[in-house]
Structures are given as structure tokens and as C-alpha cells.
Amino acid sequence: MNQFVLAITGPAGSGKSTVAEKLAKQLDKCVNIDADHVKHMIVSGFFVDKNDPKNPSGWGFNQWGLVGDSIGLLASNFAKSGYDVIINGYLDEPAWTNVEKHISITKKILLLPQLSKVVERDAGRPADFAMGHQSVTKHHETFSSDSYYRNFTKLDTTDHPIDETIAAVKEMLH
């Protein structure tokens, strides 16, 4: 397998963090950049506008751009040192665009189980991690209909055990 930069995204409960972490551990020299870890580095001064109907997430464009730039620079540094790179998590289009200003993504995968499955998985999460039915439904709709994700290879993980999903992702990398 040649060196790669892999993007794994999908709605909450799709398995992206679990797949990325376990896949990275199976490879010889790999890093897993979790987008949530980078987003959560913003401790204060986080712009949120819940009243903007054009931006239901509430995130400002500059924050998405900054997160994308940061992930892109981090991924580029690891790739230059010979690491395979997995970027996992939810990012919007401006963030992905900024990631790709710094590094080319070899493969883009969208884990997209059926809505009923992500709702079920979210309900099984600890309260401080659960998003709730309404948010999970909206999140799933975004990934199902946003034209930006047409360039991602879709993988329905509804009935896949994690190991089966990892095997499918590995096959896509060959």
C-alpha cells in the first residue's frame, strides 16, 4: 500500500472515529487526526450564531477555515515525515477546502448507515456525548443530501461490524 491521506467522515454514530482509530493501529506508520480534537482546541472566543437561518450549525466561516487550515498543516507535516494520515470527523466544505490547500487527500470515504441505526447508536451514548434525535436526524440529512459529499465514496455501515468496515476501507486504499 502506498502512502496515503484518507478522509473519513459521516454523521454522528456512523463509526468514523472508531474505524479511524482501529485502522491506524493496524498500519505500520500512521496518524489519526480527529477533527473534534482540533475543533475543541478553541477554548474561548468561539463564534456561534444560532439565529442565522442560513447557517444552522452556528459556526462562523472563519472558524471552519481555521480548523481546516490547522488540520491540513498537521497532516502535511506528518505526511512529509513518511506517515500515512487519516483525518476523521465532521468538517464542512470550507474546512475540507482549507485542508486541501496544504495536502492532497488520496481517498475520501463517507460512512453513511441508515438513519435508524445512527439514532440507535446515539441513544446508547453517554449523556454528555449524545446529540439527541433531532440533531442526529439533521446531521444525517446533511450527509445524505449535501452535494459536496458526492465526491466521497459512500459506505453503508448499517449492518457492518467494525472489523468488516475496516476491511472495506483497506480494500479501497489498494
List each model region and its residues.
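ATP-binding Walker
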Residues: 14
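Conserved phosphate-donor/acceptor-positioning beta-strand/loop module used by diverse small-molecule
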Residues: 89, 103-122, 155
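Walker A/P-loop
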Residues: 17
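Small-molecule kinase domains that catalyze NTP-dependent phosphoryl transfer to phosphate-bearing small molecules
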Residues: 124-168
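Hydrophobic anchor at the beta1->P-loop junction of P-loop NTPases
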Residues: 8
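Glycine-rich phosphate-binding loop used to anchor ATP phosphates in small-molecule kinases
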Residues: 61-103
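Conserved substrate/cofactor phosphate-moiety recognition/catalytic segment
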Residues: 21-66
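P-loop (Walker A) phosphate-binding loop of NTP-binding proteins
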Residues: 11
